[in-house]
Amino acid sequence: MAYNLAKYIARRIKPYDKLINHEIKNSMEFKDIIDNIDIEEDEIVVNFDVSSLITNVPVNRALDIIYDCLESDSESNLRCQLDLYEVTKCLELCLRSTLFIFRGGLYRQEEDVAMDSPVSPIVANLFMHSLESSAVARSSPKVW
């Protein structure tokens, strides 16, 4: 049941992916961008790439970010019959339903987002976007 609910919620929050406009698709795209930039001696290149991003996203922060997206979207009710509170609670259920079997034992992942949920990639991308936006807001990058 949690998987089907996660698929439903994923379809509802997928439009927020459009908020992410600073994503480099591959190393060739990065090379093309960096080839056209003059980096001064007192400047640095920063990479926000994260290993194992999905399993390192804190659930509470992810819920806050999605809630903010939903709250600021005046058209979210057109995509979903659930209200803001209901969508958030369903998402929380999906993110906290992290049972898995290891060596015959049943375990629950205590923190962070599970890899196998349909909502996980969207939630991880929005979390990273929020983190990057916060970091960049405190500086004035030459390229972003």
Task: List the predicted regions and their residue ranges.
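Non-catalytic interaction regions
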Residues: 1-26
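Conserved polymerase palm-domain catalytic core
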Residues: 23, 29-32, 36-144
